[in-house]
Structures are given as C-alpha cells and as structure tokens.
Amino acid sequence: MVQPRPAAPTVKFVDEYCQWYKSLFPDVRSFEAFKYLHVGCISDLKRKTLPEIAKIVGLDNQQGLHHFLTTSPWDIEKLRTLRLELILQVLKGRPIILIIDETGDKKKGSKTDYVKRQYIGNLGKTDNGIVAVTVYGVFCGMTFPLLFEVYKPRERLQAGDKYRTKPEIAAILIKKLQSMGFKFNLVLADSLYGESGKNFISVLDELNLNYIVAIRSNHYVEILPRQHIQYLKWQKFQRVFSDLSRENRFIREIIPGKRGELRYWQITTDPENLPDNTTWYVMSKYPDITPREVGNFYGLRTWVEYGLKQSKNELGWSDFRLTHYPDIEAMVGNYLQCLFNGVCIRSNCFSLHHNESQNLFHILGGIMEMAGRTFLTIFV
C-alpha cells in the first residue's frame, strides 16, 4: 500500500497547532491548504484575499485554496467541535466570562446570502451588509471566540430557514456551549439583549446565570404605588483598560422602589453633564457585586466591540469575497475562529515560553495561567 506523502511544512507553530485538526482532512492537499491559509492570514499582507495568500505561500494560483473552502469534503461542524474541545481541555472545568457581540461586515450589492441594509454595530451605522451574532469567552485576561451564527433577515430567508431574532440566536448559542460542558460565571451583552426579556433575559434566568447587560435610558421597571426612584451618590472608580492604563469613571446605583435581585446602574465619564456617548445604563443580576466590579466588567464588552474588531480585521475577517452562506460559514465563521485561537497561542507562547517545541496543551495551559497580566491582543 502506498503511503501518502507528508504535508509540506510551513511555520513551525502553525504546523504544531494545525496538527490538532489533521484528522478532519481526507487528503494531504486539503490539510496543506488549511495550513497555508493560517500562514497567509497571520502575514503582513494588507488584504488577506485568496490570490494574495496564494502568492505569499508560493502557490501558482488560488485554485487550491478556493477548492478547499468551497468543495473540499471537510466537515465544518467537526472543525468547530475540535476547536471547542481544545478550549475545554485547557479550561479544566473552570468558568469563563461570556460576551455576546454582533460582528458585521459591509457588502456591496445584494448577491451575498442574507445581506441587507441593517445596523452594523462595529461600524456604528446602518449600511448594506451581513451581521453575525458571536459569542466570546474571557478567561484570565484572554479573549477568544467560541461560536457564531449569521443573522438571517426575515425578507432574505431561503428554503428551509427559520427566522430567529438576534437575542434568540444568542440564547441558543449559550445553551449549546453549556451542553458541551462550558461553565460561565458572568454573561455580558448590549442593550439589544438587555431589553429582550422574553427571548434572552428569561433564558439567562432559566439557566441561573449571572449577567450584566446594557439597557436603554427609558427602560421600564414597574414599581408599587407610593414607591419612588432613588439615585444614590456617585462613586468614582478607575476603569482598567487592555494595556493596563486607567481612566476615572463614575457610577451610581438607581433603585426603583425597593432593591431586588435585579439592580440598575448609571456609568459615565462626566457626572455633571452626562454626555450621551460616554454615559451608559446597565442592569445586573450578580449577588453582592460592587459598583467598581460592575464598571470594569461591563467595560469588557466594550473591548470586544472596538478592540477585538481591529484584531479580527488583521486576520482578514472581511477580506474574503464569498457570497454563499455555506462558504461564509466555513471561512469567516469557523475557519477564521480556528485561526484566531491559533494566533492566541503564538502571541502568548513567545512571551511565556521560548521553546516552541513544547506540547500544544502545555503552551495553551501556560496562556490560561497568565492570571490577568494583560488582555490578549492579536499581535504583541
């Protein structure tokens, strides 16, 4: 029997990380394409398109990479499962903070599946594009992607699709992660989810999860007759950022009627003028939480929305010109999330361990044990 040739080597840390997924690929060429895409996306290419990646890894053209993404018979669900199993093995049962975020990308025209003129959070405006509900984990200062699902607008549904709101999608993803064995000590989300009592907040309550969510300034809370709203004194705290720099912020509790399990907060940079763009209203369900903890925990969600977007773009998150949902799911969702985790390993193992030949789990374990030295950024 003729033995298949070994896959061509690339960068050592890419080869080591990709070995975890080797069993998914039916032939050597598919596995090589998997590795080549890793190398191309972590390179300094300005645009991480398939033609440019093919050039930088020494291929004659992009056909092999395109075939890998669109027709090669590797299983998307198995890739996702292996990636999550790797994270679970490193966590060893320890809980994580869960962040719900929407990742949107601007798209021209209407050929791309599920494209629509809609609000794209990371752009801060309404534009033509696609939006995915994404769930991230935070552990000891490291941020990493877990699951995603593209939001399918009602008017763009295809045969067999079922319409789900973004809060409904987020609730399904949380349940899926919990069923796999992930444990959460806190869930963070913006006001779209904080104002979705039936489809999101009720699910968190059902799962007995702690949460801090943004709410609108006119959020409705029912109080009894003769009860009134109390605004407690402002407390100053220091917001600690990803680079460990600090900034003074102010927080006060708002008590509608009588303090209960749900607590309400106002956070701002200027308690005198309450500027709209730096004043937030927050609802928490977290026993014995302090005002400072509310302010800094909620800031983690802002980091994902703004800081992590830059990191994803460095990996070419929005550079791939794919129009069909299965291809988008394979590349932008699952493959790039797999790549994201791989770069997490690289950016930290060089600072923690100088011997690249160490076992993958040992490297990952070392990353997780950083105990909050700094937030993870893609390139250190």
Curated annotation (Swiss-Prot):
This is Probable transposase for insertion sequence element IS701. Involved in the transposition of the insertion sequence. It comes from Microchaete diplosiphon. Keywords: DNA recombination, DNA-binding, Transposable element, Transposition. The lineage of its organism: Bacteria, Bacillati, Cyanobacteriota, Cyanophyceae, Nostocales. One of its GO terms (molecular function) is DNA binding. One of its GO terms (biological process) is transposition.
